[in-house]
Design a protein with these regions (language model features):
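Contiguous beta-strand segments within globular domains
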Residues: 25-52
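Surface-exposed binding patches on compact interaction domains or structured appendages
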Residues: 2-24, 48-119
């Protein structure tokens, strides 16, 4: 797909629309104990000239044991107290990635120039 870039991202990283994700903490192979859930994200950015849609789907061995959801942005008006320490991802109010939502039959919007992610 022309104008589409993506990268695997840790489930611990927040994918903000205006900042390329670092990819820190990504493992080549995921492991878990029996009964544990493991997750990762697929961060993507569409650089096309207009909004498009994609219809992601899982394939391969074990696909019936996995699911894919989109990470939606939610408003955050007061991200931190003015007298807080420096260990925050951002100090600005805005739209933050937080809500996991099932993908409808309409697919996922590709918004030009913004990083977004899928949660697997």
């Amino acid at each position: 797909m022309e104008g589409f870039e993506w990268k695997i991202v840790s489930s611990m990283e927040k994918v903000f629309p205006v900042r390329e994700p670092s990819g820190e903490g990504v493992r080549e192979k995921l492991t878990a104990l029996s009964g544990e859930t493991v997750s990762f994200q697929i961060a993507y950015r569409w650089s096309g000239s207009r909004r498009e849609k994609m219809h992601p789907e899982l394939c391969g061995k074990g696909k019936e044991m996995a699911r894919i959801r989109k990470v939606c942005l939610v408003p955050c008006e007061y991200p931190l107290h003015p007298e807080s320490d420096e260990d925050y991802l951002t100090r600005e109010p805005g739209l933050y990635p937080d809500l996991l939502q099932e993908i409808s039959g309409e697919g996922v919007n590709l918004i030009p120039g913004q990083w977004r992610s899928l949660w697997v």
